[in-house]
Swiss-Prot record:
Annotated Smr domain residues: 711-786
SMART domains the record matches: MUTSac, MUTSd, SMR
Keyword RNA-binding belongs to the record: yes
Classification via SUPFAM superfamilies: DNA repair protein MutS, domain III, P-loop containing nucleoside triphosphate hydrolases, SMR domain-like
Signal peptide: none
InterPro entries in UniProt: DNA_mismatch_repair_MutS_C, DNA_mismatch_repair_MutS_core, DNA_mismatch_repair_MutS_sf, MSSS, MutS, MutS2, P-loop_NTPase, Smr_dom
Name of the featured protein: Endonuclease MutS2
Naturally occurring in which organism (per UniProt): Caldicellulosiruptor bescii (strain ATCC BAA-1888 / DSM 6725 / KCTC 15123 / Z-1320) (Anaerocellum thermophilum)
Superkingdom of origin: Bacteria
Enzyme class: hydrolase
Residues the entry annotates as binding ATP: G331, P332, N333, T334, G335, G336, K337, T338
Length: 787
């Protein structure tokens, strides 16, 4: 990629941000040297890695801090048999510990193929970690636990040092010696314990003079009684040094034996640091993975330049390459034209570097082989060239190298010279680039280019909207609408004499007046289209609310009807059973009476009556059973459109609107309502002839239930909040809302996490995300509901 283009599009500023976010030295070096790729497969692969990492971070939180140095030179030394120094060993130990921590962090990678493969490359060398931990406290301090021999040597050194200290303490407490000392203390020079002796009493304290004060008044003497002990300590110190060297060599050899797996783990950690750095940046910027293509298509939705403050950036929608290849943007200065150029160019560079873009899901970018940008006039200052010459030098280079796989971004094309010649030159350059198949976005002040864009095939106009009432740009990009200078309107609003304004209007050419009128008409049509779209969306929401309300009411009605039917059947059964019980008791009493009277004929007659009653009860019971079963078994054969039917669940008659599908579902119109029912829920209306009725179609619109678009649960416990959110989601779903917002605040994140865990299991929730700029960011969760 052209280095001038990278700088002009501020690509270097983004990778510098990522470099500072990365924790490991190798990852920082990666971002420092990162340049966009042109290989579609490599770019797609890198974006997929970042996508996995992004989703994992959202689900399981941020990863451990991967702060480590490049250990490859140290590993190479160990393989050659060299002894590593403590710092090198500790850095290798740090990598091994981070490998273990990352393996733990990546415990839930079953559905994340890339992260699962990375986890398998991370080693768990507890033996090496343990050996390093028991050896070093810091790079400069080796622990006694490093080896038993080292502990033994150091114990002897400490014992001898204590012996010297005891001897010296004994001397400074001796009144005979105290008068020879400058102070009754033990001083340290180098590693020696010494006494501060007055110079005039040099011969009174026998020993070796190791140092003296700046004035010469004090001599620092090691008494002879301590010299022999000091010599023993010196020997032990040498032994200590040799033992430490042996320990370092031992650990170096241990590392060398695992060199290959440590190297594999190191590379995995570096790659994880890189992709998670990109993922965390994407999370902070609310960025998304772009859809990539090689066919020259750009389609950005709500694109936000990452270097503009979140509360000030205005999202833009821009597309190129499908209906047109050259987009000419006109409009006032500081209206957002240059920002639009930079946004498109920067997003292409970020995408081709495997970095998400701050735009909505579904945004699409082409992988260009070349990207050129002529923005600003820095070269004119450095090289003492005019603005026009500096721009032209860049454009000459662009026209020489551009082809059908090139994106060209031109800011104020043709500026800095005579307007007529500049406009003519701009037309020729744009036409030339278009014929070469390049994709071009250019900004200009020249009105002639607006007409040129309307006349040329594969060209399109665009403008940055300007509010003439507030005299401020809105920064919205309007594709298909040429820009207006608004000079006369602005001047009039600012208070310029009306006579002057009208005089100026008279100097305008008829061509300019006609163009301004056409642009004004186009703007009016655009506003009307936006209003119609808004109305259509409102009607759509109302229709969805109607459908949801109807489905809910139908469900409630069917449930209640089934409950009543079952209750009636149960009551009928109870009556039959009760009657049977009472009759049985009655016959028992009559039988006893007949037996007492010894009337056989009466007894025989009673038995016959009993059997008649039993047959009657059985008949009634069978009728109840058949009545219940008939509601679910009776269906219609040879159903026809317009046929009159009875719908059991609604206890109403209607007409067939559509024939049953493969599952037996059909539409029936009852009055003004059209309902979806199953074939098992309808029956033929008896006594009807074969006449097919014509069904009048009517539209029904009801008002949406009064449900707020958001719910605030800040300050509530997780349990209380979830209960409220559950009820709210049911109401919102019933009302047909497509998107709602849950306000939980940032705080410690506990309430946010509890709500999100609940949302993952909720039957009405399609997806959810953090709020964007202006929505509340991480203090809210935006929920998309299912249809």
């Amino acid at each position: 990629m052209n280095q001038k283009t990278l700088k002009a599009l501020e690509y270097d500023k983004i990778v510098e941000i990522l470099k500072n976010m990365a924790k490991s030295t190798p990852a920082k070096e990666y971002f420092e040297n990162l340049i966009p790729s042109t290989n579609v497969a490599d770019i797609e692969n890198e974006l997929n890695k970042v996508d996995e990492s992004y989703r994992y971070v959202l689900k399981y939180g941020n990863l451990p801090t991967l702060e480590f140095e490049n250990i490859l030179p140290s590993l190479k030394k160990s393989k050659l048999g060299a002894t590593l120094n403590p710092h090198e060993i500790l850095q290798i130990g740090k990598v091994l510990k981070l490998s273990y921590e990352m393996r733990t962090y990546l415990s839930f990678t079953q559905d994340f193929s890339f992260l699962e493969s990375m986890k398998k490359r991370l080693v768990n060398l507890k033996e090496v970690i343990s050996r390093i931990d028991q050896t070093f406290l810091t790079p400069d301090e080796i622990l006694d636990t490093a080896s038993s021999k080292l502990k033994e040597i150091r114990d002897k050194i400490r014992k001898l040092e204590n012996k010297i200290r005891d001897e010296l303490n004994s001397m400074i407490r001796d009144p005979k010696i105290q008068r020879f000392l400058q102070e009754p203390i033990i001083t340290i020079r180098g590693e020696k314990l010494l006494l501060p002796v007055k110079a005039e009493f040099r011969n009174e304290v026998k020993g070796i003079v190791h140092d003296q004060s700046a004035t010469g008044a004090t001599l620092f003497v090691e008494p002879f009684v301590c010299v022999e002990i000091s010599n023993q300590i010196k020997i032990l110190k040498n032994q200590e040094k040799e033992e430490i060297e042996r320990i370092l060599q031992e650990i170096s050899s241990l590392i060398a034996s695992y060199c290959e797996v440590i190297e594999t783990s190191f590379y995995a950690l570096v790659e994880l640091d890189i992709v998670f750095t990109k993922a965390i940046w994407a999370k902070e910027m609310n960025a998304s993975k772009p859809i990539i293509n090689a066919s020259g298509i750009i389609n950005l939705k709500k694109a936000r330049h990452p270097l503009i403050q979140k509360d000030k950036v205005v999202p833009i929608d821009i597309h190129l390459g499908k209906d047109f290849d050259v987009l000419i943007i006109t409009g006032p200065n500081t209206g957002g034209k240059t920002v639009t150029l930079k946004t498109v160019g920067l997003f292409c560079l970020l995408c081709q570097s495997g970095i998400f873009i701050p735009a909505d899901e579904g945004s699409e970018l082409c992988i260009f082989q070349k990207i050129f940008a002529d923005i600003g006039d820095d070269q004119s200052i450095v090289q003492s060239l005019s603005t026009f010459s500096a721009h032209m030098k860049n454009i000459i280079e662009i026209t020489k190298n551009a082809d059908d796989k090139t994106l060209v971004l031109l800011d104020e094309i043709g500026a800095g010279t005579d307007p007529e010649e500049g406009a003519a030159l701009a037309k020729a350059i744009l036409k030339y680039l278009s014929e070469k198949g390049s994709k071009v976005i250019a900004t200009t002040h020249y009105g002639e280019l607006k007409i040129f864009a309307q006349q040329e095939d594969r060209f399109e106009n665009a403008s940055c909207e300007f509010d003439v009432k507030t005299l401020k740009p809105t920064y919205r990009l309007l594709i298909g609408i040429p820009g207006r200078s608004n000079a006369l309107v602005i001047s009039s609003n600012l208070g310029l004499d009306k006579g002057i304004v009208e005089m100026a209007r008279g100097y305008l050419s008829q061509k300019t007046i006609d163009l301004d009128r056409i642009i004004n008409e186009m703007e009016q049509k655009r506003k009307e289209a936006e209003e119609n779209l808004e109305l259509a969306q409102k009607l759509k929401h109302e229709a969805q609310a109607l459908k949801a309300a109807y489905e809910e009411e139908k469900k409630r009605f069917e449930t209640e009807r089934e409950r009543i039917r079952k209750k009636a059947i149960n009551e009928a059964k109870e009556i039959v059973e009760s009657s049977q019980y009472e009759i049985e008791n009655l016959f028992k009493d009559l039988r006893k009476l007949a037996e007492n009277l010894k009337e056989k004929e009466v007894l025989k007659e009673l038995e016959e009556k009993k059997r008649e009653y039993e047959r009657l009860i059985q008949s009634i019971s069978q009728q109840v059973k058949q009545e219940a079963e008939s509601k679910t078994k009776k269906t219609i054969q040879n159903l026809r459109l317009g046929q009159k039917v009875y719908v059991r669940s609604f206890d109403a008659e209607g007409f067939v609107e559509s024939l049953p599908d493969s599952k037996g579902n059909l539409t029936v119109q009852i009055g003004i309502m059209k309902i979806n029912v199953n074939l098992s829920d309808i029956e033929e209306v008896e006594g009807q002839d074969s006449k097919i009725y014509q069904i009048a179609s009517r539209n029904v619109i009801i008002k949406e239930k009064n449900i707020d678009m958001s719910i605030d649960v800040r300050g509530k416990t997780s349990d209380d909040a979830i209960l409220e959110v559950d009820k709210y989601l049911d109401d919102a779903y019933t009302a047909g809302l497509k998107q709602v917002t849950i306000i939980h605040g940032k705080g410690t994140g506990v309430l946010r996490q509890a709500i999100r865990n609940f949302l993952r299991r909720h039957p009405h929730v399609k997806s959810f995300r953090d709020g964007t700029y202006g929505e509340g960011e991480q203090g809210v969760t935006v929920v998309e509901l299912k249809d």
